[in-house]
C-alpha cells in the first residue's frame, strides 16, 4: 500500500534557501572570473564536460571506490524482499542492490536518478541490526533516491570543486583570455575571492547535506510507519562504530558523505562542518514523530 509522502515545509524552506544562496555564490564567482579575464566559453565547456562525466559515471565510481558488489535476488533474498516491499510503499522503481564486505555497519544510495539507483549495505550492518531496523535504514536510503539527493549533492559539490580548480588552473597557466587580471593585484584578488567562495560554498553544501539527511529520516519514518525503528538503528550503528578497527574506518572515510552515519570514531566534529546532523538530534526528531504517529 502506497503511503502519502507528507513534506516538512520548514525543512523544505531551509533547503531551498540554502540552494538559493549556493546558486548566488556560484553566479557571483563565475561573473567575477569572467570580469577578471577568465573566458566564459572556457568556464561553460569545463563545467559542462565534467558535470556530464560526474552525472553519468558517479554511481560506477562510488561502487568501485567502496568495493560494493551488485547481488541478485538468489544471492540476497531477504535484502531484495525488503527493498521490493519498501519500493511498493514509496512508489519507486526498484534499484539495484549491492553489498559491501566490511565490518563497518553502514549503508548508502547512489545513482543519477530514480531509474538508475543503487542501494548498498555493508555486511557489518546486516550482522548488527534486526530485520525491522535494517528495513528502516533501507527506507532512509530509498528516501534519498526519491528525493534525488545524490544528483543534487553531486552537482552542488562538483561546482564548488570546479570553481576551485578553475582558479587554480588560471593562476598556474596564465590569464586564460587576458583582461583585467593582468593589472596590479589582479591575481591576488582572484585568489582571495576564490578562497572566500570555496569556504562559503563548503559550509552551504554541508548545511544542505544535513537538511537532506533530516528529510531522508522523515521519509523513512513515513515509509515504515515506525520512526522508532530508525532511531534504534542509528543508536546501534553509532555505538558499534566506536568499536570498529581504525584501519577499517579509514578505508571508507571517503564515503562518509554518502553513509547514513559518517564512519568516524571517538571525538565528533563540529556540526557546522559535518555532512550529517548529530545522531542525538536525529533521534530526537524521530522520537517526536513516533509520538505524533502513536
From Swiss-Prot:
Active site: 141
Cofactors that this protein relies on: Zn(2+)
InterPro entries (UniProt xref): HtpX_protease, Pept_M48_protease_HtpX, Peptidase_M48
Keyword Methyltransferase: no
CDD domains found in the cross-reference section: M48B_HtpX_like
Listed GO CC annotations: plasma membrane
Gene3D superfamilies: Metalloproteases ('zincins'), catalytic domain
Record keywords, A-Z: Cell membrane, Hydrolase, Membrane, Metal-binding, Metalloprotease, Protease, Transmembrane, Transmembrane helix, Zinc
Transmembrane parts of this sequence: 15-35, 36-56, 151-171, 185-205
Keyword Hydrolase: yes
Main location: membrane
Textual note on the cofactor: Binds 1 zinc ion per subunit.
Family stated for the protein in its record: Belongs to the peptidase M48B family.
UniProt-recorded name of the protein: Protease HtpX homolog 2
Gene label: htpX2
Amino acid at each position: 500500500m502506497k503511503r502519502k509522502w507528507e513534506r516538512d515545509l520548514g525543512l523544505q524552506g531551509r533547503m531551498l534557501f540554502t540552494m538559493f544562496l549556493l546558486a548566488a555564490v556560484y553566479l557571483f564567482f563565475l561573473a567575477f572570473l569572467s570580469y577578471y579575464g577568465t573566458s566564459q566559453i572556457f568556464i561553460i565547456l569545463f563545467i559542462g564536460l565534467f558535470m556530464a562525466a560526474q552525472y553519468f559515471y558517479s554511481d560506477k565510481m562510488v561502487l568501485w571506490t567502496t568495493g560494493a558488489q551488485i547481488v541478485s535476488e538468489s544471492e540476497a533474498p531477504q535484502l531484495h524482499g525488503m527493498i521490493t516491499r519498501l519500493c511498493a510503499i514509496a512508489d519507486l522503481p526498484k534499484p539495484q542492490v549491492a553489498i559491501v564486505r566490511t565490518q563497518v555497519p553502514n549503508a548508502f544510495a547512489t545513482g543519477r536518478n530514480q531509474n538508475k539507483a543503487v542501494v548498498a549495505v555493508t555486511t557489518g550492518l546486516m550482522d548488527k541490526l534486526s530485520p525491522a531496523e535494517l528495513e528502516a535504514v533501507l527506507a532512509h536510503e530509498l528516501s534519498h533516491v526519491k528525493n534525488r539527493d545524490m544528483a543534487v549533492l553531486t552537482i552542488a559539490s562538483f561546482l564548488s570543486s570546479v570553481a576551485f580548480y578553475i582558479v587554480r588552473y588560471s593562476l598556474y597557466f596564465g590569464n586564460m583570455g587576458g583582461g583585467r587580471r593582468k593589472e596590479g593585484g589582479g591575481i591576488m584578488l582572484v585568489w582571495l575571492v576564490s578562497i572566500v567562495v570555496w569556504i562559503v560554498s563548503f559550509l552551504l553544501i554541508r548545511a544542505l547535506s544535513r537538511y537532506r539527511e533530516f528529510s531522508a529520516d522523515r521519509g523513512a519514518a513515513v515509509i515504515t510507519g515506525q520512526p522508532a525503528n530508525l532511531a534504534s538503528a542509528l543508536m546501534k550503528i553509532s555505538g558499534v562504530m566506536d568499536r570498529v578497527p581504525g584501519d577499517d574506518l579509514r578505508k571508507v572515510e571517503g564515503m562518509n558523505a554518502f553513509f547514513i552515519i559518517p564512519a568516524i570514531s571517538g571525538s565528533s566534529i563540529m556540526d557546522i562542518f559535518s555532512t550529517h546532523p548529530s545522531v542525538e538530534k536525529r533521534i530526537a526528531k524521530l522520537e517526536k514523530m513516533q509520538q505524533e504517529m502513536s
